[in-house]
Amino acid sequence: MCNRNSIFRTNKGLFCMLATILIVSSFLGVQINLESHPGETEELYFCILHTNDMHSELIPHSPAVDYRPGEEDPSIGGFARLSTAVDEIRETKSEEGEPVLLIDAGDFLGGAPFAWLTLAGYAAELIILQEMGYDAVTIGNHEYDYGADILAQYLIQAGYPEAHAKTLVLASNTEAPSNHPLAAHNLYRKTGTFELENGLKVGAFGTIGKDAALVIGETGDVQFLAQHETARQMVAELKEQGADVIVCISHSGVDEDRELAREVPGINVIVGGHCHTALFESVLQGTTVIVQAGSLGEYLGQLELAYNCNTGEVRVRNEENDPPFLIPIDSSFTCNPQIDALVQEYTLILNAYIEEITDGEFDDIMNTVAEADFVLSSIPRLSETALGNFVTDAMRFVVQEFTGKRVDIACQANGNIRNSIYPGTMAHSAGNISFYEIVESTGVGRGRDVYPGCPIASVYLTGEEVHHVLEITLLLQEFMGDSYFLHFSGLRYSYNPANAVLLTIPLVNLPIPTTRAVTSAELYTGDGIQSVNGEGYIPLKRGDDELYHLVTDAYLLLFIPMVTDILPQLEIVTKNAYGEPVPLDRIDELIIRHPDGRELKVWEAVVIYATAQASGEDGVPQILDYYAGVAGRINKIWTFPFIGWLILILVVIVTGIVFLVLRRRKHKKAVIKAPT
């Protein structure tokens, strides 16, 4: 706790007493340190450095092929650069006598190819974070990419439970059964406290939010408790433990963080993650300070704070001290040699693993797959993108090649397309697209086999059910955001976003869809890449009972029962080529496989498609210019919304009723006044 220094009042007697003490102490060799504090309060300073959503980006990236040690380049992030930035701030703060905490708000795992090492028995990310001196991390949704059992193995490999002494893993609203390894081995904790050098006691807890928990594919028996109720309990426990300052490490997103701050008093700081928001200024919700540092290690967050020992208030000091809230991690930072050595060690292991799972076709994450002079972009949000088209085309054409059967439609969700694909820009890397860049964008998840990446599944749906898919994606993106936006190959459609939802029932928060947000849908019947000019399309009509061959990410299929249980009018029945229903508990029957039984992964399809592009003069495949932009596959239009028509009809009805009532009253009055 804080020690409060008395405030001396200046008077003649006091000056005499002090003078006497100083004279005596000078003879006795006693040194007395008298501190003066402005005003009538004492403040204790401390600093929180923070990251979130680093997604296994151990090396500088975007593009990774541009990075060369010691050279200026446009690549961002990298654990060794980040470590240098942290060390520099720690050194400065140490000279000033100011303690520093280093925190990560989850999703340190999953996304870049280094995450694949988890399946090979390594815990690269967390071991490096320990070496960098992280005080605490929380568990996000992507730590569950390979399932709760694999997460437990990962934490054990990282040295837990003993490693809590280095880096606490806080997951306060996570509830694993007592016999599950996560709980049985004490692999996560509910709370933690840090006694800082200046006497300040900081309490911390970690939560995963509603949206983050919802997008986890597989948790087994692990459950997530109500975030707000858990937070209230954690705040109370930490106060009982004597915490001066309470920090919530939250993997929830800014909107949920603001809601948490409104609903749960006593949280001084929320260090956030999940929505990949770069907050260049802190958000103040009531008295709670909210921060977030973007994603992929592009920034290190720096939050300068002061704790008032008299009032218990915490205030932000960044503006007065002038450090930015976010520090770009770029080539201006050299690599910490110890951390860089660890990264290089794991890179060699990853290269050997890639050689194994690609049957020797690739043996280095920096192997060139193709070339382009443009970025295959994954933005803007909630819109057709060039990368979305490239990925879905890859899925459609490669499955067609694998099976020998025409694939009518391929679809993939934005949530599983992680990042734009950046070709190299330096003299040594110009135009190069490496294996790393492709897998970084498409290599999340795993299937039922032991290999990384989400498998591709093949289903047959009626034309009416394809319309249901379109209506469902419009509904999900409306309520749950960009991760649920679907990209398509072999199809184009137009829709009015204002018609996705007719209304929402307030008490149960249940959306009532119009099922008429899609204004038109067309199937591409030509060969090769679908045209931009409208040639080769036929209408895909509502009520069409013909079967169409659709391929998608198997993970995506698992969301169908969740939606159709709530909205049976949008029912989708997954079928095989003979039209026979195949329930999703038999999803293995729907997965596309190699001749040896291995699953065909999304990332594999994209790599195969990239290498199949026509070669340039240097013999390297060149990505078609078609993918430099979008192709008019998904078109947003604006028409008068259904709810507007409904309101208009109600107004007409009410007006008619009022008119009839007034007319009847007028008629009655006329009858009463008529002479007898």
PLM regions: where:
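Generic alpha-helix initiation/capping and coil-helix boundary signal
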Residues: 13, 19, 224, 361, ...
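Charge-rich, low-complexity amphipathic helices
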Residues: 1, 22, 151-152, 159-160, ...
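Secretory targeting signatures
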Residues: 2-33, 653-659
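General secondary-structure edge motif
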Residues: 22, 108-109, 218, 285, ...
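Catalytic centers of hydrolytic enzymes
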Residues: 39-51, 56-60, 64-85, 131, ...
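Intrinsically disordered, low-complexity segments enriched in small/polar residues
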Residues: 2, 11, 27, 37, ...
